[in-house]
Amino acid sequence: NVKGELIAMVGPVRGATIENNTFYSTGNVERLAEVWTADGTDQAADITFRNNLFISDGKNNTFNICNGENFVFESNLYWGTYRTPAQGEDMPVTADPLLVLPGASGCGREAAEYYVPTPDSPVLHEGTPPARPAETDFFGNSTAGRRYIGAFIDGARK
């Protein structure tokens, strides 16, 4: 990231859906998302953020949607130092996601296991059903069309 953002959309990004991800930001990230163009034209439009888990462990991260059009935020969970949902969000969640070991580091894909929800996590049965549900989660576990927030359907690695 060039300006300290976790997600950057610069230019004419159109019709994208950012769905069922787990984002963990440390003190190095200033904004969760930055959307802008230098001249205000050809901006990002028709973007949906749905069922994502945003954990901010550091700065008071925000969304900076400078000149985007038709951004939709649905059923995202916010936890950490920044717990304020995006403006106009439908069904936001602000609760501890109860992850296995958030903030831990590791090597490669094994580090992802620290960000898996525990069995009591509120992310496991929340969220908006996606229009086209993924067949599997990050680890290859079947989603069986269930709704969930974040990248993992449950704590079991396949």
Per-range role (PLM):
Residues 111-114, 118-158:
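Surface beta-loop-beta hairpin patches that serve as ligand-binding interfaces in beta-rich domains
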Residues 1-114:
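Predominantly extracellular beta-rich ligand-binding scaffolds that present long acidic/polar faces
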